[in-house]
Curated annotation (Swiss-Prot):
Its EC number is 3.4.21.53. GO terms for biological process: lateral root development; protein import into peroxisome matrix, docking; protein processing; protein quality control for misfolded or incompletely synthesized proteins. ATP binds at G408, P409, P410, G411, V412, G413, K414, T415. This is Lon protease homolog 2, peroxisomal. The gene is LON1. Residues 67-101 are annotated as: Disordered. Residues 689-874 form the Lon proteolytic domain. Expressed in roots, leaves and panicles. InterPro entries: AAA+_ATPase, ATPase_AAA_core, Lon_bac/euk-typ, Lon_lid, Lon_proteolytic, Lon_Prtase, Lon_prtase_N, Lon_prtase_N_sf. It comes from Oryza sativa subsp. indica (Rice).
Length: 884
């Protein structure tokens, strides 16, 4: 208990309390674990036979409250210390942050305390020493100077509380006597109320009758749960009259809170019956609102929702619809089944961006072009079309631009191009994945009559981005399906039609929403699965696969830096030379895009990361890490008003890095060790075309161009044609056409009927397309099928360095096909040197990079006879044939 006769020494060791105040007369228990606090307790309390006094000084999280002191760190003699302004307790200064130390806001006033109990312990297995100290507050003091002594602080202090003689003289003051009576009366009333609930208040009643009132003010307030600012206010109240006045106010407030709680409890219990027990919590809430003078049960939720809807900026007709729904919601109880669904619907109306848009900055086409060139290598025509699109937007911002649909194999940058458009327009970007969507409700939403109904993906996406004019990417639009639940592609017709999407009607929303401000961009791997009406609403931009040189540039400029960053590495740890990247492209990846290339680079980075992480030598990033010299305290309230404070150190971030004397350079040995033996080699075609009946074709798939081998054989049978390899109807018809043409021209092809294989009699033909798990279809394998059959029947091998593509007619004409660029790139990837193409596809060769064309021999043909002449070594002599 506070003692007016305590002799206060000139200097006190300071124990900081964070966001908590020890008042005179109060008793607290603290647990000291921090090294600086442990050092203070050992030197000032544990090692001394006569336990001295220590100072408890509050520490602020910020300088906003109370009187602050700026400590300096100096010697015990005061050098470098920080002096408090004399007599100006309300002034404050702020400690400068040096060497990254945290600013400490010390309060300028504290309480001298003595240890009533002290115990020492050792934690296992760490062996850390801890102390539990029970402290009693004695008297207030003011800090004149604060300095450091080793790892803790000491302060030069002066007493603030009155001495015994001064107190005896002050007790004769009539105003103080009146305040004392008022405080005791309020405190006694509080004790009377608490006696009905607690049996331990008897001791408090004895204290009230025996202890001087100036001591009771601090003791009573210390037992209440009050804010840190109010605790500081009591600590700063040196004048007895001010202290008693504040204490009386706090005691009275505590009393009133207890009385109000009792009143609410009595009112609720009086209204409850056995059938109403389940509404206990709701009755209590209603009673609390009545005490506050607020009888509107929906003010906190429904009224707030209404204000949010008013600020949403929805059109007048939709606002009327929302008001009707809101009135319906007000009439419902929260327990009713439709309450939650109705509320969720109104929240959606309030959150939709009816008027909110992204502010477009003035388009800078030069900057947009530089950004596209920086983020995407190659794709010259595609980037030029995007620049044209942006130029039109600049000249006519309200123009209805076309819906761009990027079609190309995976990994060529379709999604990132859409993101670049959003970046150039300064609009928000959202991606809607349509892969595997088979339900029309995913686009239009579910009707609200269904349980668990929700809006469609478009409306939900607009709610998430919170603007009505984003760039919306409809990803994998060719992967949608249809079943009994509807066709999502048909629902997209309204979305992508500029004449209709201004009044798009989502089934869940049930009111029109304007989608005309949205810029739609779609991506697909193939055009064929997209329904023609939907395809007609989009402008298709084809993205071909990358050439090996383009892949090399992309890897060196984009992929390798990104992979190293993702794995916590840099060029000082791992270096991948261009030659090794080229080997990865040629031997480990054969794709149109660069995803597999990135995966292989990531495998190399992971292998390097293991080597780096296994190193034993560790270097600190910070070479001079300062010791923690100041401790903040984390406090919490315990039962009975007792405070237990856990001493913890301030947070300090100390980072480590790994020492790597020399970078790891990837070579062929490391490639084989990490990636395994090469998956592809240039001799694959030669090995597979080693016998008659095998030819090399070129096909286009959703993954880009590919090399397709065709194998044929014959056996005794009934003249049937067998086809295997998961083939579609078109390619089956091409095989039938090829066999018919070969049989019809057998004599011209010098295929003797007396040979081991007679084309005109009982022989079955089996044609197989390897990679049987991959579906295949299309007419471009016609010339390849004819070449394979002629090779089979003539016992001549097809040239292994030659690949071909083209549709043929029954009269032997070779018709043009699509995907020429991708097919030529595929031939180049496989090491093919000669490519046979329809002559009418010559215009498509302009899209093939010149370095690729220079390494290939392109053979343009009009008829199938020319194909056969180029496909066999030494040509294929034909007899004159009819021109019919």
């Amino acid at each position: 208990m506070a003692d007016a006769a305590v002799e206060l020494p000139g200097r006190l060791a300071i124990l900081p309390f964070r966001n908590k105040v020890l008042l005179p007369g109060a008793i607290v228990r603290i647990r000291c674990t921090n090294p600086s606090s442990v050092k203070l307790v050992e030197q000032e309390l544990w090692q001394r036979e006569e336990k001295g006094l220590i100072g408890v000084l509050p520490v602020h999280d910020s300088e906003a409250a109370g009187s602050l002191l700026s400590p300096g760190v100096g010697s015990d003699s005061g050098e470098g210390g920080s002096k408090a302004p004399g007599g100006s307790a309300g002034e404050s200064t702020k400690q400068d942050t040096k060497n990254g130390k945290e600013t400490i806001h010390w309060h300028s006033r504290g309480v001298a305390a003595r240890a009533l109990h002290l115990s020492r312990g050792v934690e296992k297995p760490s062996g850390r020493v801890t102390y539990i100290v029970v402290l009693e507050g004695l008297c207030r003091f003011s800090v004149q100077e604060l300095s450091a002594r080793g790892s803790y602080h000491v302060a030069r202090v002066s007493r603030l509380d009155m001495t015994k003689t001064e107190l005896e003289h002050a007790e004769q003051d009539p105003d103080l006597i009146a305040l004392s009576r008022q405080f005791k009366a309020t405190a006694m009333e509080l004790i009377s109320v608490l006696e009905q609930k607690q049996k331990t208040v008897g001791r408090t009643k004895v204290l009230l009758e025996t202890v001087p009132v100036y001591r009771l003010a601090d003791i009573f307030v210390a037992s209440f749960e009050i804010s840190f600012e109010e605790q500081l206010s009591m600590l700063d109240s040196v004048d007895l009259k001010v202290r008693l006045s504040k204490a009386t106010e706090l005691v009275d407030r505590h009393l009133q809170s207890i009385l109000v709680a009792e009143k609410i409890t009595q009112k609720v219990e009086g209204q409850l019956s056995k059938s109403q027990k389940e509404f206990l919590l709701r009755q209590q809430m209603r009673a609390i609102k009545e005490e506050l003078g607020d009888n509107d049960d929906d003010e906190d939720d429904v009224a707030a929702l209404e204000r949010k809807m008013q600020n949403a900026g929805m059109p007048a007709n939709i606002w009327k619809h929302a008001q009707r729904e809101l009135r319906r919601l007000r009439k419902m109880q929260p327990q009713q089944p439709g309450y939650s669904s109705s509320r969720t619907y109104l929240e959606l109306l309030a959150e939709l961006p009816w008027q909110k848009v992204s502010e477009e900055r003035e388009l800078d086409l030069r900057a947009a072009k530089e950004s596209l060139d920086r983020d995407h290598y190659g794709l010259t025509k595609v980037k030029q079309r995007i620049i044209e699109y942006l130029a039109v937007r600049k000249l006519k911002p309200d123009a209805r631009g076309p819906v761009l649909c990027f079609v190309g194999p995976p990994g060529v940058g379709k999604t990132s191009l859409a993101s670049s458009i959003a970046k150039a327009l300064n609009r928000k970007f959202i991606r809607i994945s349509l892969g595997g969507v088979k339900d029309e409700a995913d686009i239009r939403g579910h009707r609200r009559t269904y349980i668990g109904s929700m809006p469609g993906r478009l409306i939900d996406g607009l709610k998430r981005v919170s603007v009505s004019n984003p760039v919306m990417l409809l990803d994998e639009i060719d992967k949608t399906g249809s079943d009994v639940r509807g066709d999502p592609a048909s629902a997209l017709l309204e979305v992508l039609d500029p004449e209709q999407n201004k009044t798009f009607n989502d089934h869940y929303l049930n009111v029109p929403f304007d989608l005309s401000k949205v810029i739609f961009v779609a991506t697909a791997n193939r055009m064929q699965p997209i329904p023609p009406p939907l395809l007609d609403r989009m402008e298709v931009i084809e993205l071909p696969g990358y050439t090996p040189e383009e892949k090399l540039k992309i890897a060196m400029k984009h992929l390798i830096p990104r992979v190293l960053e993702q794995h916590g590495l840099s060029s000082t740890y791992l270096q991948i030379p261009e030659a090794m990247v080229r080997l990865i492209i040629e031997r480990y990846t054969r794709e149109a895009g660069v995803r597999n290339l990135e995966r292989n680079l990531a495998a190399l980075a992971r292998a390097a990361a293991v080597k780096v992480a296994e190193q034993d030598s560790v270097l600190r990033l910070g070479k001079e890490i300062q010791p923690i010299t100041t401790t903040l305290l984390d406090s919490r309230l315990a039962d009975g008003g007792e405070v237990e404070m856990e001493v913890i150190p301030m947070g300090q971030d100390i980072s480590n890095t790994y020492e790597n004397p020399s970078p790891m350079i990837v070579d062929e040995a490391m490639l084989e060790k990490v990636l395994g033996p090469p998956r592809f080699d240039d001799s694959e075609a030669a090995d597979r075309v080693a016998s008659p009946g095998v030819s090399v074709g070129l096909v286009w798939t959703s993954f880009g161009g590919e090399v397709q081998f065709v194998e044929a054989t014959a056996m005794v049978g009934k003249g049937d044609l067998h086809l295997t390899g998961q083939l579609g109807d078109v390619i089956k018809e091409s095989a039938q056409l090829a066999l018919t043409w070969v049989r019809a021209r057998a004599a011209d092809l010098n295929l003797s009927p007396t040979s081991d294989i007679n084309l005109l009699e009982s022989r079955d033909i089996h044609i197989h397309f390897p990679a049987g798990a991959v579906p295949k279809d299309g007419p471009s394998a016609g010339v390849t099928l004819v070449t394979s059959l002629v090779s089979l029947f003539s016992h001549r091998k097809v040239r292994a360095d030659t690949a071909m593509t083209g549709e043929m007619t029954l009269r032997g004409l070779v018709l043009p096909v699509g995907g020429v660029k991708d097919k030529v790139l595929a031939a180049h990837r496989y090491g093919i040197k000669r490519v046979i193409l329809p002559e009418r596809n010559m215009k498509d060769l302009a899209e093939v990079p010149a370095p690729i064309l220079s390494g290939l021999e392109i053979l343009l043909v009009k008829r199938i006879e020319e194909v056969l002449d180029h496909a066999f070594e030494g040509g294929c002599p034909l007899r004159p044939h009819s021109k019919l």
